[in-house]
Amino acid sequence: MIGKLKGVVDSFGEDFVILDVSGVGYIVHCSARTLQRMPKVGEPAELSIETHVREDMIRLYGFRSDAEREWFRLLQTVQGVGARVALGVLSVLEPEALASAIATGDKGSISRAPGVGPRLAARLAAELKDKAPAFAPVDPALVALAGAVEEGAAPQPVADAVSALVNLGYPQVQAAAAIAAALKGAGEGAEAKVLIRLGLRELAR
């Protein structure tokens, strides 16, 4: 089995990169997020690899981090999730955001992935909540804040700040995480506009 490939970027396809390793071109399928962050053609690159072997083919899946690869494996333990859907989830949520979405039950963020409807998103959140890998710890403050926002129990400035970031196009889980971080710096009594400004700064990092 292949665990890692290190070579030079040869070319890109719609959902794959061809990595030239000592003159051999390997077709490696990746999430859209990973492809966007790959070096340019002709530049060196390294990917962690998951190898899938079937009777009629061998397919390689590539990841920029071991965390992304582990989530790819974990997602496929849920019924109805294959390699394509798992890559779709990782295309819209990086590992840290996915861990937060699972921990907080944020089905809306998960269902943004292609091929993931509300039912499958709910199943993913429910079945993986207790299986989330130890390498993806979630801030307890984020879980508490997300729950308060969901139940309508969050202070109004906090709820308004999260809503504002969501309206700007950020997934609920990322908006909540940014505002949770903003609260730590600004304090519990901060106004919504202050939280929004600090939250946007967090998201820009």
Curated annotation (Swiss-Prot):
Keywords associated with the record: Cytoplasm, DNA damage, DNA recombination, DNA repair, DNA-binding
Region of interest (Domain III), residue spans: 153-205
Location of region: Domain II: 65-143
GO biological processes: DNA recombination; DNA repair
GO MF terms held by the record: ATP binding; four-way junction DNA binding; four-way junction helicase activity
Pfam families: HHH_5, RuvA_C, RuvA_N
Disulphide bonds in the chain: none
Compartment(s) where it occurs, according to its Swiss-Prot or TrEMBL record: Cytoplasm
Chief localisation class: cytoplasm
Region (Domain I): 1-64
Domain of life: Bacteria
Keyword Transferase in record: no
GO CC, any one term: Holliday junction resolvase complex
InterPro entries with a match to the protein in the record: DNA_helicase_Holl-junc_RuvA_I, NA-bd_OB-fold, RuvA, RuvA_2-like, RuvA_C, RuvA_C_sf
Ranges for region Flexible linker: 144-152
Functional summary from the UniProt entry: The RuvA-RuvB-RuvC complex processes Holliday junction (HJ) DNA during genetic recombination and DNA repair, while the RuvA-RuvB complex plays an important role in the rescue of blocked DNA replication forks via replication fork reversal (RFR). RuvA specifically binds to HJ cruciform DNA, conferring on it an open structure. The RuvB hexamer acts as an ATP-dependent pump, pulling dsDNA into and through the RuvAB complex. HJ branch migration allows RuvC to scan DNA until it finds its consensus sequence, where it cleaves and resolves the cruciform DNA.
UniProt xrefs under HAMAP family: DNA_HJ_migration_RuvA
Similarity section: Belongs to the RuvA family.
Quaternary context: Homotetramer. Forms an RuvA(8)-RuvB(12)-Holliday junction (HJ) complex. HJ DNA is sandwiched between 2 RuvA tetramers; dsDNA enters through RuvA and exits via RuvB. An RuvB hexamer assembles on each DNA strand where it exits the tetramer. Each RuvB hexamer is contacted by two RuvA subunits (via domain III) on 2 adjacent RuvB subunits; this complex drives branch migration. In the full resolvosome a probable DNA-RuvA(4)-RuvB(12)-RuvC(2) complex forms which resolves the HJ.
Domain remarks in the Swiss-Prot or TrEMBL record: Has three domains with a flexible linker between the domains II and III and assumes an 'L' shape. Domain III is highly mobile and contacts RuvB.
Annotated protein name in UniProt: Holliday junction branch migration complex subunit RuvA
Natural source organism: Methylobacterium radiotolerans (strain ATCC 27329 / DSM 1819 / JCM 2831 / NBRC 15690 / NCIMB 10815 / 0-1)
Encoding gene (name): ruvA
